[in-house]
Regions:
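Surface beta-strand/loop "capping" patches
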Residues: 235-237
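Cytosolic regulatory and coupling regions of membrane transport/channel systems
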Residues: 227-232
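Short glycine/proline- and charge-enriched loop/turn segments
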Residues: 9-19, 130-135
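Short secondary-structure capping/turn micro-motifs that flank functional sites
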Residues: 4-5, 170-171, 202-203
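Extracellular glycoside hydrolase catalytic/binding regions
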Residues: 23-47, 51-191, 207-226
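Extended hydrophobic/aromatic segments used for targeting, binding, or gating
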Residues: 194-195, 205
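Aromatic-lined carbohydrate-binding surfaces of glycoside hydrolases
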Residues: 1-10
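Acidic carboxylate-rich catalytic motifs and surrounding loops in phosphoryl-/glycosyl-chemistry enzymes
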Residues: 165-167, 196-200
């Protein structure tokens, strides 16, 4: 989750990949070559997600070029594991065509790429949910309308995709209808998704689905998510 950036000073400043000779596409590719060499024979590795949410890349090093260098490096040592490529501009599903259309030119000799988009329902698409449901003008189809840009792109170019992040707050039950409509749309179009977020570290974070009261009380989002949950080996469910 470093957005195509790296800090050399403990987080005080961040350098973009491709911004200088200190941090190039080849450096990232070298990391992935080594990771693929190490983990290629692990049957529990579903795919290599090469970078989370790149955005505002340096003009001399667009994300599509960096991704191609990484793909080439991985395929030097692993020809089988799927490679997951996030879109540009924070992987936005809504703005996929504007910022990530060029990813369709990526070449994988193994023909095993999965493109990943992210989607949040708030007005500014950020997932911070700073305003209320009413203030952001949410409708039952907000998620579907945003997902269509990505899903239709996948269909148009015969690509495989994943909605790698989506989530709604637990502070208003009305969020559950657009969430469910999104999941129905993804299911009907054969696009899997992974919810953001889960796990005990999130505390009272309003998008989290970690159960409370010693795992005895589910968060409200689970009433929808459980209807669409599948596990490995049951992807058609």
């Amino acid at each position: 989750h470093n957005f195509a950036r790296y800090s050399f000073d403990g987080g005080k400043t961040y350098t973009l990949i491709g911004e200088s000779s200190n941090l190039t596409a080849e450096h990232l590719a070298d990391v992935w070559r080594k990771l693929a060499q190490e983990f290629k024979d692990y049957n529990n590795i579903w795919g290599y997600d090469i970078m989370n949410e790149p955005y505002s890349m340096h003009p001399s090093a667009p994300w599509v070029n960096i991704a191609q260098v990484v793909i080439d490096a991985i395929r030097e040592v692993d020809t089988e594991t799927p490679i997951i490529v996030c879109g540009d501009s924070f992987s936005s599903a809504r703005f996929w065509v504007e910022y990530s259309d060029n990813l369709r030119t990526l070449v994988d000799p193994s023909d095993n790429l999965i493109f990943q988009a992210h989607l949040y329902f708030d007005k500014d698409y950020s997932g911070q949910y700073l305003n209320s449901y009413d203030a952001d003008g949410i409708t039952a189809n907000t998620g579907v309308e945003r997902a269509k840009y990505f899903v239709e792109w996948l269909k148009r170019y015969n690509k495989r995709g994943l909605l790698g992040e989506y989530g709604v707050p637990d502070d208003d039950p009305r969020w559950l209808e657009p969430l469910e409509n999104l999941l129905i749309y993804l299911r009907d179009n054969g696009v899997p998704g992974t919810y953001w977020s889960a796990g005990p570290r999130w505390g009272d974070y309003k998008l989290a689905v970690q159960p409370s009261d010693n795992y005895t009380v589910d968060r409200s989002q689970m009433s929808v998510l459980e209807k669409y949950t599948v596990t490995a080996g049951n992807e058609s469910g």
